[in-house]
C-alpha cells in the first residue's frame, strides 16, 4: 500500500469517529450544560400561545420601593473616665486566670452582684459569658444580695 492511500484511510476513519461523536452528543447522551440550557429555552417557548404572552409582564420597580424610616440614634452619654477605668479593671480580672478575685473586689467596694452587673453593662465591659462566670461563682463566695444600709 502506498502512503497516500494510508493517509486517505486514516482521514476517513477520523471523520467517521468525529461524526459518530457529534451524533451521540446531539441525541442528548453527552450534552454540555450550555447546550442543555439552550435546549430548555427553545422548548419552553414553543407551547406558549399569544394569550399567555399577553399576561406575561413585569411590574415597574420604582413604584413599589418602600422608604424605610431610620430612627435617630441617641448620642452616647459621656461616661465618667474614672468609673470606666474601674469597670475595665473588673473586666480584666474577671476574664483572667484569677477570675474569682472579682468577689474580693466586690466585697471591698461593697457591691452586690446585681449592682456589679449593672455597672459593667453600663460601661460595656461584660458579656453573657462574664455574667455566667459571676453567677456560677457566687455560691462559693458568699456575696450578699444586698448590704445593710446604715441609718
Curated annotation (Swiss-Prot):
Transmembrane segments: none annotated. GO terms for cellular component: extracellular region; host cell nucleus. It is found in: Secreted; Host nucleus. It comes from the Eukaryota. Residues 1-19 form the signal peptide. The keyword Transmembrane does not apply. The keyword Glycoprotein does not apply. This is Secreted RxLR effector protein 30.
